[in-house]
């Protein structure tokens, strides 16, 4: 049976896993690493880089290197003004007021949606998994923060489809982590999953036991993660530098990118060390000459700079326990997820809130992908007797008279679920109703997120309050919402799947899928060209080495032919014609083969002459003291005298 790929599509890094023989296995990428940076870059030549290759060139190509795209997926341009200030690449307002990113590819302006950028990351994971397993991967389970709203979930699913994957399930990250933690646990437990990653924070409380994983409550903050800690360190470095030199580095993207990378290194190092030396030579220059940054950051200083961020995890935890109708004393185990939970301060806060030491048996960077792989195996019947009962993180409502948000499905309701309610008209002879679907906890519609709007037309004339309109909310196992409205008098019905006012149509997803596939083909061509250049360059080097060492043993005309072929190879690898490179290399290899045979024969003849035995004694007319003896053949069957 084909594997289902479990994917943790993270803000900073992504990870993938499968279930093999009933056990989850984390897959390494093509570079041999167990996590892949969630970074996409476009080079001046038009090449697309993903992962570590994109990260390596970020400093010199900051405007065309896209990271932390998860902070923009499924969100309106108007919602992300603070996030935009933190990234060197250009975020613009796209279709329907959504976010989009603008880059320059081979001298041309290109606009990509966050779904497409995410799809490029997923395509890399898919390709690496296929290479590792030697089979085609077509299905995946992809994780999202528990506190992602409907638009963000839909957008993540669309990213999977653009990447050529059938997304079997969108699963919440803390829930996935609980699956990885509790798969082999037999006793009943209540666990708290504290998940602080690169861009989001989630807290979930679950009851697990005998294969049942039931989420009791979830809470979080989709604008809080490691990126914010990096930003705090960056601001400290930049503001101190401005005080010392009067130079504001905010307007220098390359300098900002270098500072960001150094801030991230400092943050990671200070999880184990007490101080870190920040060293950024030649960060900029003015009329007095080059400027450098060299300063010490201690763990204590880092904790002071980011205290307000760490404190932001406290209230969601308290709210989650309250919604679950539990206290910290009721929790049996604390599971920490996400790279940020390696920070001593974060561990201390989580420990104080839950009142127990964190469980040490899971890898915070890999546990979510492992859980996604387990869920994939459950859906395919490879892992049995596991039941996952997740919840919807936010209340779903419709707008009613006076701009009130009337709840249909309260937050922390177990999904899948379905809820119907009867509404009526507000005016006499009202011919249609407008259904505004909302998500959030505020009592007034305007203060919640608008997920979508649709109309039910053709209502027969009647006094206000007489028509009966049945509105039904249906949330599937992915946490994605479907809404219908039915006039019970006429039977007329209108249905929509909420793709959000911020979302991609089926046609757009299909178009982007085709474009992504074309990109994949271009990537393969680029890879083939790069390999051809490397092979040709190596062949030229080996031929030169051969001529240096053994050229004196080769006919000068043939030697000249090889030298011409080497020159031709050196010339064609400057261009991009893969076939021409291969032809030149084949011609060179043919000539080298011919002179190699000649050199081998020459060497063999010389060796043969050198190793010939001396003439036997008595040969060549010299007198010998050896006496010749006569021998007679004896027939062994003949009797002897």
From Swiss-Prot:
The modification Phosphothreonine is found at residue 200. SUPFAM superfamilies: Actin-like ATPase domain, Heat shock protein 70kD (HSP70), C-terminal subdomain, Heat shock protein 70kD (HSP70), peptide-binding domain. Residues 630-641 have a biased composition (Basic and acidic residues). Transmembrane segments: none annotated. Keywords: ATP-binding, Chaperone, Nucleotide-binding, Phosphoprotein, Stress response. Induction: By stress conditions e.g. heat shock. Belongs to the heat shock protein 70 family. NCBIfam families: PRK00290.1 (NF001413), prok_dnaK (TIGR02350). HAMAP family: DnaK. Acts as a chaperone. This is Chaperone protein DnaK. It comes from Methylacidiphilum infernorum (isolate V4) (Methylokorus infernorum (strain V4)).
